[in-house]
Regions:
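Generic recognition of flexible, low-complexity loop/linker segments
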Residues: 3, 85-93, 120-122, 164-168
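Secondary-structure transition/turn motif
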Residues: 5-7, 67, 135-141
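Non-catalytic terminal regions with compositionally biased, polar/charged low complexity
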Residues: 105-178
Length: 178
């Protein structure tokens, strides 16, 4: 997941990106999160979903465990409570040009997640206000999110031209090139 050019003029409240927010409803979930420790770059939830933060995103990460969180809602003056954990990326008040990078790995375990963190299997080719382009190093896939009509694209990519904003995913197959 990539985010680019995050900005606003709100100086009263901080801006954040939520990576995950999970309710701890069962006793098993409580026990899991009570004993949970992260290295600050990788997180794994009790469902086996792993989260990897790039080095630049770890600086703004905020992990919170709220057992319980008591809130008074907008529609009722009666307090409600619940137990939850969250991971957010903090961009500050009135951010200008903030960005983030993280990966979500479903059906993983702690060992596989740590291995991924040591050697991520993707490469960000472009991350700016015009495009997010990411290449998977394991399966020859390149994903393009073009926000604007691109002026330039990576020279070594199969997508050489686009006349509008679009989403494109291309798998290179050198064995079947014509």
């Amino acid at each position: 997941m990539l985010g680019t050019d995050i900005e606003n003029t709100n100086t009263e409240y901080p801006t954040e990106t939520t990576v995950f927010q999970l309710a701890a409803i069962t006793p098993e979930n409580h026990k899991y999160w009570d004993g949970y420790k992260s290295d600050g770059q990788t997180y794994i939830d009790p469902n086996g979903v792993g989260y990897y933060l790039s080095k630049s995103s770890t600086r703004s990460a905020k992990y919170e465990k709220n057992f319980p969180q008591v809130t008074v809602g907008e529609r009722s003056t009666k307090p409600t409570s619940g137990d939850w954990v969250s991971l957010t990326l903090q961009h500050g008040k009135a951010p200008r040009g903030a960005s983030y990078e993280y990966a979500v790995l479903p059906r993983t375990d702690a060992v596989s997640l740590k291995a991924f963190a040591k050697k991520p299997s993707y490469k960000v080719l472009q991350q700016d206000r015009n495009a997010h382009i990411v290449r998977s190093l394991t399966d020859n896939l390149t994903s393009y999110v073009l926000f604007e009509t691109p002026q330039t694209l990576p020279a070594d990519g199969l997508l050489q031209k686009a006349d509008t904003s679009c989403l494109v995913m291309i798998r290179e197959d050198r064995a079947n090139c014509y």
